Amino acid sequence: MKQTVTMIIEQDPESGWYGCDLDGTLAEYHGFEGLDKIGAPVGVDSPDSALNTVKKWIAEGRDVRILSARISHDPKGDGKAAIEAWTEQYLGRALPVTEKKDAKMITLLDDRAVQVEENTGRIVGGAKALQAAGDAHRQGEKGR
């Protein structure tokens, strides 16, 4: 007889983690130039920027991690080391780096993500939001 096990994970801010993309979200990005080439921080003077939000989360003692595709093909760990050094320099400490999200991730700040309403699949902002995201990505690719 087969048994089914259902696991419910509650989003407890004390036990989960907060993710933030690097390229184009925390750091300037105009196309890939190498694992160890990371742009200058963006949004330094904007209180509601991703950079300052991450700094606030760190000050509040939250578990903050960098979620970056940059390290998905990084066998020697050069990209990960560069990201850790960048976060130490601009955020005050080396943050953990991953290329994967998991069930404990509470939220993600990312320049390429488009918000989808939970359990409906509806794109928040509709087709306009999707079009704007595509346009922004194409514009960034032209800057290379």
Where are these regions (language model features)?
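Catalytic phosphate/metal-binding cores of nucleic-acid and nucleotide-processing enzymes, i.e., regions
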Residues: 1-143
